[in-house]
Amino acid sequence: MDNNNNNFSTPKQPTINSTTGGQLRSRSNSSPSTSSISTPRNGSTTATTSSITNSIGKGSLVFSTMENAKKTLNMDSLSTPMSQSSKKRLSMNSSLLPPSSIPLPPSQQLSAKKDPSKRHSSFISTTTTTSLGSRPSTPQPNHTTNNNNNNNNGSNGNNVTSTNISSMLESNNSEILSQNQKVTLSTSSNTAFSSLPSSTNNGNNPLSNSGGGNGNHHLVNSNSSTSTPSPTMFISTTSPPPELSLMEGFNQHNLTTTTTTTTTTTNNTLNTSNGINSNSLSPSSHLNNGSNNNNNNNHLNLNNRSSSPSPTPSSSSISGRRTPIQNFNSVGGVNITSKTQPLFSDREESIQAVCRFRPETAAEQTLGPSEKQLTIGTDQTTIHITPTSSSSSSMAQAFRFSKVYQPNTTQESFYNEVGKPLIDNIVNGYNVGIIAYGQTGAGKTFSLGFSGGEGNDSYNSYCNRSEFYNNSHYLYGSQQQQQQQQLLPSSWGIMPRIIKDLFIKQDEQQSMNTPQRIKFTTKISYLEVYKEKVYDLLSEGGVNDIEIRMADGGFIVPDAVQSSIQTFTDFLTHLQHIEKNRKIAETKKNMASSRSHAIFIVSLLKEDLENKMTVTSLLYLVDLAGSESASKIDGTTSKIEETKSINKSLYALGGVIEDMSKNSKHVRYRDSKLTQLLQQCFGGNSKTCLIVNCSSSNHESVIRETIQSLNFGQRAQSVKNKPLQNVEESHSELKAKLRELNKDIETYKKFIEKISINSGVIPPSSVATYITQLQNACEELKKKNDRLQEDIINLEEENSDLPKKFNVLNKNNVSQIEILTQELELSKQINQEQLLKIEQYSQKYQATNEEIQKSFNHRQQLVNDLHDSNEKSKQLELKLKDALLNSKSESDEIRLKLTKALEESTDKDQRINTLESNKQKWKSKCNEVVRQSKELQDRLNILQSTYSNSVDSLSNSSLNNNNNESLEEIKKLKLNISSLTNQHIEREKSLQKEIDLARSKHTEQTLILKNLKTQIDTLTNKLEIQFPTIVNNNQQQQQSTQSSSSSSIESNLIISMNTIEVLFEKICKNQEQTNTIISTNVESIMGKLVEIDENEEFIRKEKDRERERAENLKNTLEDAQSNFLKQQEEIKQFIETQLKNKNNINNNNNIKNNNNNNKLKSKKVGSSSSSSSNIGSSICINILFFLIILVILFFLMVAVGLTIQNQDYNSQYRSSYFFKTT
C-alpha cells in the first residue's frame, strides 16, 4: 500500500564513500549524478551542508514558450508562498535558466567552488525533499499538484520584468541578523544547545544515520548520535519548468515547494544474508510514475539484487555432487551504498537480461568431473567459466547480466525483483515483455509459472478457494495482502503473480479516485507456435495456422481470440483450459518438455471517464521451447521435425538480434512466425526482460549448453527498444494546447511589432556577425554574473559559519560570549556593508537582465528571419518542382517525337527493302529480255547472212534504197536506245549512291536522336534523384536549426541556403548544358535537313528533265514507230505489187513459151521463178516480225525504267518529308 499517493517521486539515494564491502557495477547506459559525502578519518562526525547544483550540462537551454521565460525571469509570479530567503535562492537559481537559446558557459551553474565536496549535494531543509540530479517529467493528468510553473494567472503575459533581488537580499539578511541575535541570547543564558534543533538517529531527520530511514533521505552520515543542523536559510529549490530537460534518463514528476514538512519515516531492517542488502530502495520507486511502494519485501534494486534467503537444499548432501553450493555464494558482501539504477527507463534502452540457475538434477549429480568450473561473481552480475587445471587448453570466459540468481532463489523473491517492478509500467501505458530462454529442462516454464500448483496440486485446488478471494478482493491493507499471499502456491512463477498484482493495482487506483471515474478492461490471448504454425489455444480445439498480417505498427494476428477477464479466478479457469491444449512431450532431459513456443498476451485498457483519456498496454509472457540437438533425440521422425522447427525459429530469433545489434537496415522478422509475433519485444516499443535459464552443473556437456544460452543472452542485451507510453489525449486537452500555442503566437507577434518599431530589420548578410557580437556580449555578462554569484555564495558561507563559530566558542569557554557578541556587532556592520555591495550587484544584475532581454528580442527577430528563409527555401523547392515537371513534360514530348520518327524510319526501311527487291526482280526480267533480244539478233544475223543474196537479187533499186534507209533509221534507233539505256543505267547508279548517302544520313540522325533520348533520360533521372535529396537536406537543416543555438541557426541557415543555391546553380547549368546540346543537335539536324531538301530539289529538277527527255523520246519513238509502220506497209504494198507484176510477167512468159512449143523449158523456168519468189516473201516476213519484236522490247524496257525512276523519286520525296517534319 502506498504511503504517499501524491505526485512526488522517490528521491535517489546518494553514494557514500566507504572502505568496506564490494562495489556493484551497473550495466545501465547512463548513471545520474549523485552526491558523495566524505567521512573523516578520525571517526568524528561533521555536518554536511552544501549548495544546490542543477546539472545543466555543457549545452544550452531553450525555453519552449515565452511564458516559461517570463516565469523564470519574473519570480514574483510564483504562487506558492515561501520565505524571503527561499525567494533569494530561487532568484539566484533563475540565473541558471537563461532566456531564449543563448548558450551559457558551464560556469553559470551554482556550485561551491571552494569546497569540492559540496558541488554535488543538494540543499537540505525541513520543508521539502527533492531528488538529486533528477529532471521533472510531464505531469500526469490523473493527479493534481501545486506546481509553481503552472500558476501564473497573476502575472502579465506581455511585460517581462526582473526580480527585485535587493529587497529579497535585505529581507534575507534581516532574517540572518534576527537568527544571530537569538543565538547570542541563547548562548548568554547557557541554553545554546537546547535552542537549536539537533538531529538524532530516529529516522525523522534528513541527516540521520544510514542504519534507519525510509529511503526518502538525501544524505547519510556516519554512525553518530548527533549532528549539527543546516541553517534554516538553505531551502530546497523549486524544480524548473517541465519543458526544460535538465537531466536525461529519469522518470519523475514535477516537484512542488510547500512550507510544511512532508518527509515520512519508516524503520526498515537490513537482511544481510550472503552479505547482500535486501532492503535498499524499492525498484518501483525508480520505475513507476509517481508511485512509492514501501513494502519491505520489495525494496530490492534491479541492478543491486541478491538471491533471496532460502534453506540449503537437501540434495547437497548426496554423494557424487560435483558442484558445491558455496561456489554460487558471494565471497564478500555487496556495498549497500552503491548506486541504485533502475532496470527500465523511459528513453531508448537495451533489453535487460537476467540469468537464473536451477539446482542440479539427480542425473547431473552423478556425472563425472569436468575441466571447467562455473562461478558467480561477488557483484551478482557476472558469471565466470574458468578451467580447473592450468594444463587445459580452454580459455576463461566471463558473461555479464543485469542480475544473476543462484539455485536457491525462491519463486517469490525472483518475481519481486523481476516481475513486480513492471506492474506500474503496464498500468501507466507501457508495453512489457518477459521472455524465458534456455535449453531443454533449464526451468523456463517453472520460472514463468505455466506449470500447475504447489507439489502435485493443480489449478483446480486453487479455484476451490476462489470464493474467499472474491470476498476479500475489494479489501485493502497489509492483512488482506498477507491472506492473498498465503493463497498463492510458492511454486507458482511470474505469470499468475503478475496477473494477481495487476488486478490489485487496478482496484487500488479505482478506490483512490471517485467511483466510476477510471475503468479497466483486461483481455487475454494465448498463441502457440508449433512447427511454424500459429495455434489459438483459447479457441475451441485450437485453430490451426492463424494468419499473421502486416500492419502500420508491425505484425498482428486479427483472428486470435481475446477473452475478457474481470477477476483472478477468471484467469485461472482460462489457464486450466489452455494448458490441456499445449504440445508437451518427453525427452531425455525433461519428462514434460514444451515442444512449442507459448506466447501469453495480456491487453490492458485504462479509461479516464472524467478527462476522456485512454491508456493501452500489452504484456507479453513468452515461454520459448528448449533448443536441443537432433542427434540426441531418440524418437520418431515427428520428434525430429519438432526439434528442427524449434531450432529453426530460435535461429531466426538469433538472426533478428544480430541484425539489431549491427544496426542493419533490414531486420529479418519474416524468417519465422515467432520473430513476427515478438517484433514489439525485440526492437519495438516495449520494456523487455530476457530470462536466461541455465543448469548449475559443472559437467562439460551441460556447461557447453550453458555457454550457448549465456552467449544468446549477452547478445540480446545489445538490442535497443524505444518504450513509448500509449496514451490517447482527449479533444479538450488538445484544444487547450492549441489555445496556448495561439497565445504564444500572439505574444510573438506583439514582440515582433515592438522590435520592428524600435529597431530596423537586420539584413541577412550581417545576421551572423550580429549573432556573434550578441554571443560575445552575453558571455561577458555571464562572466560578470558568475563573479557576482561567487561573491554572494562566499557571503552566504560566511554568514552560515557564524553560528557554528558561536557553538564552538560556547563549548570551549562560556566566558567568550562577550567576544562573540562583539564579533556579531562587527558582523552586523559587515553585513550592512555587504548589503550595499549586494544592492550594487543587484543593480548590475538587473542591467544584465535587461541586456539579456534585449538579446532575447533580437533572437526572436532572428527566428523570424529564419522563418522567412524557410519560406524562401520552400519557394525554391516549388520552383524546382515546376522545373522538374516542365522538363519531364518536354522530355515526354521529345520521347513521343522520337518514337514516331523511329517508327516512320522503320517503315521507310521496310519500303526501301521492298523497292530494292522489286528492282532486283525488274532487273532480272530486263536481263532476260536483253538475253532474248540478243538471241533474236543472233538469229536475225544468221538469217541476214543466209538470205542476203536472195534479197539482193530480188530487190530492185528502189526497194534497195528504201530498205537501206529503213535499216539506217533502225540503226539510229538502236543507237539512241543504247545511249538511253546507258544514261538510264548511269542515272540509276547515281540515284543508288544518293539513296546510300540518304540512308547513311538517316542512320546518323537516328543515332543522334537516340543519344538525345539517353541524355534526356539521364537528366530526368538526375533531377528525380537530386530533388528529394535537396528536400531532405532542407528538412534536416530546418530540424537542426530549430534544435541548435542562435549562432548555429544562422550558420546552418547560410550553409543550407548556399547548398541550395549551389545545387540550383548546378541544376541550372546542367539544364543549360542539355539545352545547348539539344539546340546544337537540332541545328545540325536542321542543317542536314536543309541539305537534304536542296538535294531533293536538285533531284526533282533532274527528274523533271529526265521526264521531259523521256517524253521527247516517247514522241520520237512514236513518230519513228508510226513512220516505220507506214514504211512497212508501203514496203508490203510495193512487194505485193512487184510480186503480182512478176507473177503476171511470168505467167505471160509461160504462156508464150507454151505457145512456142518449148513446154519443158518454160515449165522449168516457171518453177524456178515461183520458188525464188516464195523464198523472198518468206524472208521479208521474218525480217518484219523480228523488227516488230525489237520495238516491243524497247518500249517494255523504257516503261520499266520509268516505273523504277518514279518509285525511287517517291521514296526520296517521302524521306525528305519525314526529315522535314522531324
Curated annotation (Swiss-Prot):
<keyword id="KW-0505">Motor protein</keyword>
<keyword id="KW-0813">Transport</keyword>
<dbReference type="GO" id="GO:0005737">
    <property type="term" value="C:cytoplasm"/>
</dbReference>
<dbReference type="GO" id="GO:0051661">
    <property type="term" value="P:maintenance of centrosome location"/>
</dbReference>
<dbReference type="GO" id="GO:0008017">
    <property type="term" value="F:microtubule binding"/>
</dbReference>
<keyword id="KW-0472">Membrane</keyword>
<keyword id="KW-0812">Transmembrane</keyword>
<feature type="compositionally biased region" description="Low complexity">
    <location>
        <begin position="216"/>
        <end position="238"/>
    </location>
</feature>
<keyword id="KW-0067">ATP-binding</keyword>
<keyword id="KW-0206">Cytoskeleton</keyword>
<feature type="compositionally biased region" description="Polar residues">
    <location>
        <begin position="326"/>
        <end position="343"/>
    </location>
</feature>
<dbReference type="InterPro" id="IPR027417">
    <property type="entry name" value="P-loop_NTPase"/>
</dbReference>
<dbReference type="InterPro" id="IPR001752">
    <property type="entry name" value="Kinesin_motor_dom"/>
</dbReference>
<feature type="compositionally biased region" description="Low complexity">
    <location>
        <begin position="254"/>
        <end position="325"/>
    </location>
</feature>
<dbReference type="GO" id="GO:0007098">
    <property type="term" value="P:centrosome cycle"/>
</dbReference>
<dbReference type="GO" id="GO:0016887">
    <property type="term" value="F:ATP hydrolysis activity"/>
</dbReference>
<keyword id="KW-0547">Nucleotide-binding</keyword>
<dbReference type="GO" id="GO:0005524">
    <property type="term" value="F:ATP binding"/>
</dbReference>
<dbReference type="GO" id="GO:0007018">
    <property type="term" value="P:microtubule-based movement"/>
</dbReference>
<feature type="coiled-coil region">
    <location>
        <begin position="724"/>
        <end position="1026"/>
    </location>
</feature>
<dbReference type="GO" id="GO:0016020">
    <property type="term" value="C:membrane"/>
</dbReference>
<dbReference type="GO" id="GO:0000278">
    <property type="term" value="P:mitotic cell cycle"/>
</dbReference>
<feature type="region of interest" description="Disordered">
    <location>
        <begin position="1"/>
        <end position="55"/>
    </location>
</feature>
<dbReference type="GO" id="GO:0005874">
    <property type="term" value="C:microtubule"/>
</dbReference>
<dbReference type="GO" id="GO:0007019">
    <property type="term" value="P:microtubule depolymerization"/>
</dbReference>
<comment type="similarity">
    <text>Belongs to the TRAFAC class myosin-kinesin ATPase superfamily. Kinesin family.</text>
</comment>
<dbReference type="InterPro" id="IPR036961">
    <property type="entry name" value="Kinesin_motor_dom_sf"/>
</dbReference>
<dbReference type="GO" id="GO:0005871">
    <property type="term" value="C:kinesin complex"/>
</dbReference>
<dbReference type="InterPro" id="IPR027640">
    <property type="entry name" value="Kinesin-like_fam"/>
</dbReference>
<feature type="compositionally biased region" description="Low complexity">
    <location>
        <begin position="122"/>
        <end position="165"/>
    </location>
</feature>
<feature type="compositionally biased region" description="Polar residues">
    <location>
        <begin position="75"/>
        <end position="85"/>
    </location>
</feature>
<feature type="compositionally biased region" description="Low complexity">
    <location>
        <begin position="26"/>
        <end position="55"/>
    </location>
</feature>
<keyword id="KW-0493">Microtubule</keyword>
<dbReference type="GO" id="GO:0005635">
    <property type="term" value="C:nuclear envelope"/>
</dbReference>
<feature type="region of interest" description="Disordered">
    <location>
        <begin position="75"/>
        <end position="165"/>
    </location>
</feature>
<feature type="compositionally biased region" description="Polar residues">
    <location>
        <begin position="1"/>
        <end position="25"/>
    </location>
</feature>
<keyword id="KW-1133">Transmembrane helix</keyword>
<feature type="region of interest" description="Disordered">
    <location>
        <begin position="188"/>
        <end position="343"/>
    </location>
</feature>
<comment type="function">
    <text>Microtubule-associated force-producing protein that plays a role in organelle transport. Its motor activity is directed toward the microtubule's plus end.</text>
</comment>
<feature type="binding site">
    <location>
        <begin position="438"/>
        <end position="445"/>
    </location>
    <ligand>
        <name>ATP</name>
    </ligand>
</feature>
<keyword id="KW-0175">Coiled coil</keyword>
<dbReference type="GO" id="GO:0030705">
    <property type="term" value="P:cytoskeleton-dependent intracellular transport"/>
</dbReference>
